[in-house]
Amino acid sequence: MKPNNMKQTNISQFFAPTKQPEPIIEEGFDSFFDDIPTEELEPDLNSIPISSSQQTSTSNTSSQQTSSANTSSSATTTTTTNTNSQIPKAPTTPSKLKLPTSFTSKSNTPTKSLPPSNFSLVVNEQEEENEMNDNSKPQQQQQQQQQQNLFKSNITSNSGGSSNDLFSRFKDEKPKTTTTLSTPSKPLSQPQRNNTNEISKKRKEMDFNEDESNTNYDNNNNDVEDLDEFCFVNKNKPSSSSSSLNTNTTTTPKAPTITPKTPTKTPTRRPVVTYDEDDDDDEQDDDEDDDDDDDDKKSKSTTTTAVKKKGNAFGKKDKKEIEERYSFLVNIKDANGNPKDHPDYDKRTLHIPASCLSKFSPFERQFWDIKSKNYDTVVFFKKGKFYELYESDADIGHQQLHLKLTDRVNMRMVGVPEMSFNHWASKLIHLGHKVAKVDQMETSIGMAKRQNEKGGRNKKDSIIQRELTSILTAGTLLDEQMITDQTSTYLMAIKENEYDKQYGVCFVDVSIGEFYLCTIQDDDNRMQFETLLLQMMPKEIVYEKGATSPKTISIMKRVLSTVKPVMNARLSLEYWDPTDTMERITQLCGGKTPETLCQMKNEEYLMGALGGCISYLMDIKIGNSVVEQARFKRFNPLDIGNSMILDGQCLVNLEIFNNSTDGSTEGTLFKLMDRCTTAFGKRMFRQWICRPLANKNAIVDRQKAIEFLRDSPETLQKVTAILNKLPDLERMIARIRAQTSKISDLISVLNHFDNIHSKLLELLDEAEQIESIHLRSCLFMDNQQDNDDIDEQENSNNNNNIRYSGYPNLKPYIERVRKSFTIEQDRVVPSKGLFLEFDQCLGNIQSLEQSFAKHLEEQKAHFKCNKIEYKHMGKEIYQIEIPVAFTKKLPAGFSLKSSSSKVNRYHSPFVTKNLTSLLEERDTYEVLSKEVLKKILSNFAIYFNHFQIAITKLSQLDCLLSLYKVSFQSSIQMCRPLFVSSDQRGFIDVKDMRHPCIYSKSGDDFIPNDISLNTENNPPSLMVLTGPNMGGKSTLLRQSCILVIMAQMGCYVSASSCEMSIVDRIFTRLGANDNILAGQSTFMVELAETSAVLKYATKRSLVILDELGRGTSTFDGYSIAYSVLNYLATKVQSMCIFATHYQSLAYEPTVRDLISTAYMTCHVDEEAKKVIFLYKLASGVCPNSYGLHVASMAGLPREIITKAEEKSTQMEKDSVLVSFIHGTISRSKLVEKIVQSYKQKDLNQLIQLSNTLKDLNLNK
């Protein structure tokens, strides 16, 4: 720390002039001046600020200044100095120091620039460092520098000599300021006099304020007061007389005088405060880590003073200016010695030469030992009551979080209070960083014990032990305060065989301990892999460095562009082989291999992905807890046969989860349908949308469930009451099982499940009335099943296994867990005999506390004063507080610990003797309490499977309630879809269909339409849809698919009637987008998506194709569109809506009898060149796309549109003639097309055309 950079503090900024406290008396302050070295008393001109009045009057003559000074001296006997002059700095210690000196002025002129007559000066080392190195106030620093320069030049010119001569003269003049210290009105008693020096020392370790004050690092948090480098704390109410502040109004600097109540002591020298440049390496406000401070200071203490030594007032370079930068941070290399530009550079590690390690202090060695292994991670390092970030991490905290930076050559630092760790860590994680948390593993008492056990102290043992306890990443968050998303948060690990297009994939939601595993045999377009990504939307990805193809990496970045997942490239050796993976999982699962994994052990790439995932979890310190509670499930992104398939392209084109405008959920199907009350219900509902049912009976059962809720309002009210205000029980029980939760979480979980149990009992009378088996299983307990024999059904892949088994009876388990502990005075106490060591420790504490209480009563009797009480102040606890008036009866052996004007506080011999024992027992209690908590939580984990089944039932109940709300609480007309079994071709017949997402915004303005495919009234299963641009074709296509998805989820649909067969899959080819990342053009994307349709579509599929062939030339595009249309109509025979601007496709002879035609109607104003879109579907073919009319409406210049009309007419005429010549249209059709083209043209042109036709073979 450089004193020259100190901020000049104006005392007045901390006080309102109308509120001033009464003076108080603090004893023992005089000794503070006695230890100050004489050689450190020389003034530092750089620290003397210039008041605004001085700055504006620098041109005044010295005689004017002398006159002002003489005038001032007549009003007071003291030499005046500037009211804004530098306040003496307190010694830099980890604790706070208060200077309880009463300042008053004898002048009658009021002022706002001096402090109240009584104030407390609290100096916090870290806050002082931060404030004096604050680069966010350049204007203020510049102004101060200008003031100092002006003052120096003014003094130099008046003295007629150089600055050095001036300094020599100035230092010989002793300050004439009369400083008086408040002393007790009564003589000190003998114990008080004996302990005066002790009090002086204690002032460096204690804060005499009644309320503890912590350093405020968070200077950007508006909820927390932003402390300056000094904090003046008013402790008493203002006095009407003695507290008024006065000063002389002169341009000569004034010095405050201190008016005593008793005879005063005038020191002959002023206090000097020393600063350690490495103080920020010490603990901040840390009563537990004093030894770290000592070690750091011994290792690298270079002390500078606020007042420079002789001859160093100007020009001397301090340590900060000459200190060299760590060499290993100048040329950064990884642990293997590879520089940053090396292809094998590992950004996770840092190479530190042995020569640097030997120069580190124990604390620095401790820090760099952890940081060098996690160099790509922002490390929060616990020091006392704060978490601190150093070096590059400090830069990130300063630049991205705007935290105040303590800038130094090495070990620059920012810090945050420990209570706000989650807040700042969450921000960094949201910005894409990984965050490491380093905690203190012992208290100062524990450290002392450890040192005593080792029989001494060495450098390694001289600091608090710290360990890296966790690494937080976007995909592995466990703390409920940091998980802001109620949907699942996934970490994905993949292992790829590029040659065979095979993937092994592992997804894990660590918040609930679920692993999803699958092997994908994909095609060239990686359609299944893309579908998997869109279904799961992982927040973080682990992939094998050098073994993952660029195409796969490109797909992940493109598909997940809205999520922006954290990408972790891992070395191949960090991917465990299948055998090693199975052995480690078996070991963590108590020697029992999960049955699901036994079935997958021969799938090499799947097990490789699982090994890579668990290896990563181990590295971030959560692998053991997650795997121990894990449930492994096989996952199939295309669950053929069990549910309707919605591939990735379908999820994107239909805007199921994210819209195409800004990537948000606004206007999506999920946003419309998700009415779930609980977080775990929302997670299940997302899976319901991804996998609509493909079983008629299951769909009908859901329909019956929501209809029962509609028809039974009393039951509906009770069901709603069960789910209302439930916390995220699924994640809470997972944390309890992992033993990472608080006892309050366990109590909350037990209370909620007990309340649910009571409410379910109220529904027993309605059991026989519910037709839906699904709803009945969610509401009623399966009393026929012995709860001790409930199978671990949550490990099953088929939800049907648990859907109809009934809600488990949890009452016996709740009572067993509750009996294992009690809560006494906010402390967790295990049942007696469960933890003998804890019982003994608690008994010792209670016995000691009782003896302390008895001792207090004895003191009250001795002093005959009931106001005597214990006072706990920071680390100094059990201080016996005695009013000053009663201290005459003070027994021998009492040691003074602190005092005020009204009371003194002591430690009696009894307290001194027994306090250490009490502190040791309490420290042991804290350690044992953690073990007790783990034991209690482990008792709950025994019954975890039963609670998980209950969560599944509640999730399903919440999803059914959401379907009910969408079906019967929407403003849109809804109907129950009727499903008809059909083993042949699929069909759909819908009346008055609307798009529910658009209708929710447009209301009754939305135009309904009918769709009929493969019905009695409309036998063809393929419809060719034409119409003008912007006529509503794409909307019709999407709403048809949305209706099918809603229907097969068991929900009502937005139509007046709906009859359909089960659809096995929906294919969509919508829009025209290129894929730059994959190197694919618009046409290539079209063909790839169309290829999947032709390859996988069946007679029961619904296919949506929009403007196929527009990505290439007209003739090539038409040819492809015709070929696909022909193949779908003759070979696949699936339900299909084929939207196109190629009207001629409807007349192709090979398909015209196999298709139906429809178009979106409109009204055309030829004169105004405008189109009024009617958005109503009609049978037939639209004669024109009216693209030029739309162009006119869009504002294109008239000249361009006229030219386009001429060219369009000629091209259309040529196209018709060519088609006639090649025999693709008949003579009558040719004439019809020509007449349509010329019906509003000049008659001469029509005659000219007739002559042309005569020359052709019209008999063709």
Swiss-Prot record:
Taxonomic classification: Eukaryota, Amoebozoa, Evosea, Eumycetozoa, Dictyostelia
Self-association and partners: Heterodimer consisting of msh2-msh6 (MutS alpha). Forms a ternary complex with MutL alpha (mlh1-pms1). Interacts with exo1.
Cellular location(s): Nucleus
A Pfam entry, by short name: MutS_V
Species name: Dictyostelium discoideum
Biased composition, class Acidic residues, residue ranges: 24-43, 275-295
Keyword terms, alphabetized: ATP-binding, DNA damage, DNA repair, DNA-binding, Nucleotide-binding, Nucleus
SUPFAM superfamilies, per database record: DNA repair protein MutS, domain I, DNA repair protein MutS, domain II, DNA repair protein MutS, domain III, P-loop containing nucleoside triphosphate hydrolases
Location of region: Disordered: 1-304
Polar residues bias locations: 1-15, 101-123
Record GO biological process: mismatch repair
Similarity annotation: Belongs to the DNA mismatch repair MutS family.
Protein name, as recorded: DNA mismatch repair protein Msh6
Recorded superkingdom: Eukaryota
Oxidoreductase among keywords: no
Keyword tRNA-binding: no
Function (record text): Component of the post-replicative DNA mismatch repair system (MMR). Heterodimerizes with msh2 to form MutS alpha, which binds to DNA mismatches thereby initiating DNA repair. When bound, MutS alpha bends the DNA helix and recognizes single base mismatches and dinucleotide insertion-deletion loops (IDL) in the DNA. After mismatch binding, forms a ternary complex with the MutL alpha heterodimer, which is thought to be responsible for directing the downstream MMR events, including strand discrimination, excision, and resynthesis.
Record's compositionally biased regions (Low complexity): 51-86, 133-148, 177-189, 234-266
GO molecular function term, any single one: mismatched DNA binding
An example Gene Ontology CC term for this record: nucleus
Xref: NCBIfam families: PRK05399.1
